[in-house]
Swiss-Prot record:
Gene encoding the protein: rimO
Pfam family, one: Radical_SAM
Binding site for [4Fe-4S] cluster 2: C148, C152, C155
The organism of origin for this protein: Hahella chejuensis (strain KCTC 2396)
Job of this protein: Catalyzes the methylthiolation of an aspartic acid residue of ribosomal protein uS12.
Cystine pairings recorded for this chain: none
Cofactor binding description: Binds 2 [4Fe-4S] clusters. One cluster is coordinated with 3 cysteines and an exchangeable S-adenosyl-L-methionine.
Protein name: Ribosomal protein uS12 methylthiotransferase RimO
Compartments reported by the entry: Cytoplasm
Residues annotated for [4Fe-4S] cluster 1 binding in this entry: C15, C51, C80
Positions of the MTTase N-terminal domain: 6-116
Length: 439
């Protein structure tokens, strides 16, 4: 390998927040003239952006580092697992350097030591003003803040990413505008805690296009809603002021979609998680949201088998599912994470019980999901095309986020292109997906 070639291999793991970090590093690499290598053997060095949220993610990251070391030998590690350098070096002592998440300057300095900066080339350095994106051209993640002020007992992300730091609202809206001008049809708003946006700045007033705008979720949504694209909210903590964005959904300014992790419904379990413990209030709010915005899609995630969870607690959760009738739900079996305070809680749940509860949970939610999707047969809706395959077009409705939700299949519609917006009539459904035809 030539040390003057300026080629960098890149492996990106983890959540959409990590994807955005990877995009920023890749953008800086391309801006400085580095080539991004598609293979290990052609790269001067390999960057691995890791995840460290749960044990399986840690193992995946360690495996990826090991593969890069075997195939190339020169590896720089960054990302959430990088905050635990001792864990990485215990398994892979030969990595060149380790840094934590969003350590962009440190990562670039490490790259410079291994692969010298290429000579400036105005053609190589023509990077789009949106930067390098790892998503398809028609949608993009818009990260509005870093870190989190909550200390949920099952989560160690604040130890990686620190407390909440909100981006200036003018910077966020400027990035959104550039993305839209370059053809993005859907903005996926992400952070560790989207509804806390601006709390750390005391909702400081920023400026956008000469107008004062508060650094706050409602005002952000209001401005994004003027850009003429789909706007989807992710990772929304159930603060009371979440209610303020529902009218924007009802008015069509942003998508009627709320990704709001409730985690459980039992007051005792929620207390042990250090989460809001008012299931009855949550059900009341869900009812109000649906009154204001009948088309709203509610996505949530839950944990079963948390330490101390009794059969009665679990039944409370199942009852909540039946009453809430959520559209999209993810469920995880509790897994101890090194450094999480939940590890100190008494009465751990046996693995066989966790599995049994997870299966019961999924059986209930699968039935709910199937029922809610069956109700869409015969209705018309707008979908966005994600890809076109031999059988037809694979799309998503306003109720479906990329990768985590369902899809809408349009058989034989091979003339469509990714990013096309199409009005369809739904003809069939199963537990998670829909089938339709253009109208």
């Amino acid at each position: 390998m030539s040390s003057s070639s300026g080629k960098v291999g890149f492996v990106s793991l983890g959540c959409p927040k990590n994807t955005v970090d990877s995009e920023r590093i890749l953008t800086q690499l391309r801006t400085e003239g580095y080539e991004i290598s598609a293979s290990y053997e052609d790269a001067d060095v390999v960057l691995v952006n890791t995840c460290g949220f749960i044990d399986s993610a840690v193992q995946e990251s360690l495996d990826a580092i090991g593969e890069a070391l075997r195939e190339n030998g020169k590896v720089i590690v960054t990302g959430c697992l990088g905050a635990k350098e001792d864990v990485i070096r215990e398994v892979h002592p030969k990595v060149l350097a380790v840094s934590g998440p969003h350590a962009y300057t440190e990562v670039m300095n490490q790259v410079h030591q291994v692969a010298p900066k290429p000579e400036y080339n105005p053609f190589v350095n023509l990077v789009p003003d949106t930067g390098v994106k790892l998503t398809p051209k028609h949608y993009a993640y818009l990260k509005i803040s870093e870190g989190c002020n909550h200390r949920c007992t099952f989560c160690i992300i604040p130890s990686f990413r620190g407390d909440l730091v909100s981006r200036p609202i003018g910077d966020v809206l400027g990035e959104a505008q550039r993305l839209v001008k370059n053809g993005v049809k859907e903005l996926l708003v992400i952070s560790q805690d989207t509804s806390a946006y601006g709390v750390d700045t005391k909702y400081r007033t920023g400026f956008w296009e000469g107008r004062p705008v508060k650094t706050r979720m409602k005002e952000l949504c209001d401005e994004l809603g003027r850009m003429g694209v789909w706007v989807r909210l992710h990772y929304v903590y159930p603060y009371p002021h979440v209610d303020d964005v529902i009218p924007l959904m009802a008015d069509g300014k942003i998508l009627p979609y709320l990704d709001i992790p409730f985690q459980h419904a039992s007051p005792s379990v929620l207390k042990n998680m250090r989460r809001p413990a008012h299931a009855e209030k949550v059900l009341h709010r869900i009812g109000k949201w649906r009154e204001q915005c009948p088309d709203i899609t509610l996505r949530s995630t839950f944990i079963v088998g948390f330490p101390g969870e009794t059969e009665e607690d679990f039944q409370t959760l199942l009852n909540f599912l039946e009453e809430a009738q959520l559209d999209r739900v993810g469920c995880f079996k509790y897994s101890p994470v090194e450094g999480a305070t939940a590890n100190e809680l008494p009465d751990p749940v046996e693995e066989v019980v966790k599995q049994e509860r997870w299966e019961r949970f999924m059986e209930v939610q699968q039935r709910i999901s199937a029922s809610r999707l069956q109700a869409k047969i015969g209705k018309r809706m707008d979908v966005i095309v994600d890809e076109v395959v031999e059988e037809g077009a694979v799309c998503r409705s306003k109720a479906d986020a990329p990768e985590i939700d369902g899809q809408v299949f349009l058989d034989n519609q091979t003339h469509l292109k990714p990013g096309d917006l199409v009005t369809v009539e739904i003809e069939d459904a199963d537990e998670y997906d829909l089938w339709g035809r253009p109208v």
